Structure formats: structure tokens, C-alpha cells
Amino acid sequence: MMQDLRLILIIVGAIAIIALLVHGFWTSRKERSSMFRDRPLKRMKSKRDDDSYDEDVEDDEGVGEVRVHRVNHAPANAQEHEAARPSPQHQYQPPYASAQPRQPVQQPPEAQVPPQHAPHPAQPVQQPAYQPQPEQPLQQPVSPQVAPAPQPVHSAPQPAQQAFQPAEPVAAPQPEPVAEPAPVMDKPKRKEAVIIMNVAAHHGSELNGELLLNSIQQAGFIFGDMNIYHRHLSPDGSGPALFSLANMVKPGTFDPEMKDFTTPGVTIFMQVPSYGDELQNFKLMLQSAQHIADEVGGVVLDDQRRMMTPQKLREYQDIIREVKDANA
């Protein structure tokens, strides 16, 4: 008995479970079929809502085109008016229609009313898809108020910012005046000069008087005027003096007795122009200075008491030529 009851319960439970499964499967299939059936309407609604949203965006960005609606006067018989009212027709707009520029709606010219500026722009009326437009109560005819035409404001004509201007003739570039070089004034030539050279002892020493006297006499100098030595045209002291020799220490004079005499050096000088050939006299003067320097152990210096150089010798020769040309 217990086994039969258990078997019955098992069978009843299995039937109940199968019934629940069948019912659930049937319910889900029904909901899915209804969802697929309503999807085209939802798509059309969503597309229409998108178009309405685009129109709202355009209205928000700026005041759109003013639309003029013709006001129909209510007839005496309302039933005839309702009967003559055409049924609204709904046109389906494809999804890509919103991307195309909207064409302005042309109204009949005879019923145009001057635009009235409302404080708030009228919002476009959204019409649901596939639903008839509800009937609106008849409006009382409103007499159109003609707004005064705005008077044109005559502003003073302003000249164009960039008016055409005739091109001015471009003047040909004038050559810059070339400053004439100032006439070079010829440096006046020397008509006389003094050529100087020195024979000096080495630094920190002095020339011995006895050695100096012997070297001076060997070079052909003779003690004479102004208590100095002179080199004449002839070695015996005859003829005009060619160049002279003086003491480097002021007053530049000598004592013929030079045994106990010392000096840092002597100065040899020649005045140009002089007797004879000045260039030959200069060579003789240079040879005499070198001979005395060799005998007393000294050195030959220029007029600035610097070491004699070949450049300085050429400078002396140029001075002599210049003086000769000036006195030619």
C-alpha cells in the first residue's frame, strides 16, 4: 500500500513539473513573439522622436523661420465644419530625411499676416505616429493686428575700409652722392734732419775713458769745436765736418785727458744735408760706430737707445733721401 502511494506521488510530481516547464516555455515564447511584433512600431517611434529632437535643437539654437497659420472663421453650422474638415494625413519620413535640408513651407500669399513677435518662440507640435489628431475646440476668430512697419534706419554711408587708391609713382632710386675724397695733402718733405746713433756699454757697466779715446782716434775723429770730436772729410782734420761725436751724459763735452774718465756711452750724429754724398757719409758714420763698439766692448743703439736693426737703418736712409729730394 505504501509503495503504491509513493508511486502515485512520484507520477503526480513528474506531471506537475512537466506542466510547469511547458507553461513556462509557452509563456516565454508568447512574450518573445509579441516583442518581435511590436519592434517595427518602436523603431518608427524612436526615429520620429529623433526627428522631433533635431527640430527642438534647431529651435533652441536660434529663432527659426516664422510660420504663418491661416485662421479659418468658424461657420454658422459647426457640424458642417466638422464634416468638411479633412482627416489628418501622416506622412512617414525615412531616417535619412533629417539629414537633408528642410524646405520652407510656402503659404498662400493672399492670407499672409504680418509676423507678430511673441515673447516666447512657439514650440513645434509633435504628432505621434499612426494616431489621429485629437479634435481641438473651435477658436474664436481673432482680428489680425497689423504691426507697424519698421521704419528703415538710414545710417550714414561709411567709406570702405580699404578704398582703391591709385598707385603712386615710385620714384626711381637716386644714386647716393659719392663724397669726393678730400684732397690728400702732400706731407711736406723734410728739408733737414739729424741722424743719431749711440754706442753704449752693456747694462750695469760703463766705458773706459782710455779705451774710448784710442778707439775714437782710430775712427778718424779729432777733438774740436764745442769740446767734442768731429769727423772731417780728410783724416788729418782738414775739410768740412761730416758727422760728430759727443758724450751721452750732459752737457755732452769731453776732457782730452780721458785716462780717469768713464761714461755709459757716446752719441754720434750727422746733420743732413751735409757736404758731399749724405748716403756715403751715413755708411762711414755707421762703420765708425761699429768700430768703437767693438774696441770698448759696447753695442750700437738707435736714436731711441734700442738695439740697431736693419729696419731702422733703412728708415735712416729713407729720411736722407727725402731731405735730398726736398733740397734738390
UniProtKB/Swiss-Prot annotation:
- Name a single GO biological process: cell division
Entry keyword set? Cell cycle, Cell division, Cell inner membrane, Cell membrane, Membrane, Transmembrane, Transmembrane helix
* Segments crossing the lipid bilayer: 7-27
UniProt topology in membrane: Single-pass type I membrane protein
Tell where it localizes: Cell inner membrane
Molecular function GO labels: protein homodimerization activity
Might you report a single GO cellular component term? plasma membrane
Which segments does the topology annotation call Periplasmic? 1-6
Please give the record's induction comment: Repressed 1.5-fold by hydroxyurea.
Q: Residue spans with biased composition (Acidic residues)? A: 51-63
Show the ranges annotated as biased composition (Low complexity): 97-115, 123-171
Complexes and interactors: Interacts with FtsZ via their C-terminal domains. Can form homodimers prior to association with FtsZ.
Which NCBIfam families does the record cross-reference, listed alphabetically? Answer: septum_zipA (TIGR02205)
Q: What does this protein do?
A: Essential cell division protein that stabilizes the FtsZ protofilaments by cross-linking them and that serves as a cytoplasmic membrane anchor for the Z ring. Also required for the recruitment to the septal ring of the downstream cell division proteins FtsK, FtsQ, FtsL and FtsN. ZipA overproduction protects FtsZ from degradation by ClpP by preventing recognition by ClpX. Does not affect the GTPase activity of FtsZ.
Query: What PANTHER family does the database record attribute to this sequence?
Result: CELL DIVISION PROTEIN ZIPA
Name the chain's protein: Cell division protein ZipA
Organism of provenance: Escherichia coli (strain K12)
Q: Which gene encodes it?
A: zipA
